[in-house]
């Protein structure tokens, strides 16, 4: 019995279910289940959502098999970050690139599908009709992008230019619920200097405790070797 089959058997696989990652289904090349393809059908039939967070697994050499196939199966897809740096536009780009590599088809995953997953797909997963889109009665959550930014040029298709080229470099303003929280690329709701100092302090405390907490008593350089040892 696969994990998805088990959820179905328990009766908890519904349109309110959000499956984190959803990578190792019964037809993933790394698994050897008895009924390949049944998991995709179950997810689609029950209206469940897969929260696709590519970076955290790609760092380990693991990829969804694959985004375009899930979309074509009728599964609602959402996109998340799950690991630092939390950059939604970078995640969207990686979703597309990994899907095309795994599918061995550059046309398998469209920017339209990626943008949909990052907006409307996520809203649907949360059962929200007031977010994920710009319509009367919806929350005023939106970004303003500088289409004159060099990384956006030529701007024949601004969505593709934003996802595949510019990323957050071209983002000028961000509004959440109608409130401006980013202006000229800088967050207005955080004290960067204080946050950076607190982060450095926390890292120092963590590094000092690593040998005591690690099962083998290893130091930080043994667990996460520096790029250039000795520097």
List each model region and its residues.
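Conserved strand-to-helix beginnings and helix N-cap segments that scaffold or border functional pockets
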Residues: 33, 61-64, 89, 156, ...
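Flexible loop residues that form catalytic
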Residues: 22-23, 100, 148, 179
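Short acidic/glycine-rich loop or secondary-structure boundary segments that cap or lie
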Residues: 27-29, 59-61, 86-89, 152-154
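Active-site microenvironment of metallo-dependent hydrolases
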Residues: 119-231
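Histidine/acidic residue-rich metal-binding segments in metalloenzymes
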Residues: 1-49, 60-77
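Active-site beta-loop-alpha junctions enriched in small/polar residues
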Residues: 22-25, 55-57, 82-84
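His/Asp/Glu-enriched, well-ordered alpha-helical/loop segment
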Residues: 9-16, 49, 65-152, 163-167
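Generic structural signal for well-ordered, non-membrane alpha-helical segments
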Residues: 36, 81, 85, 111, ...
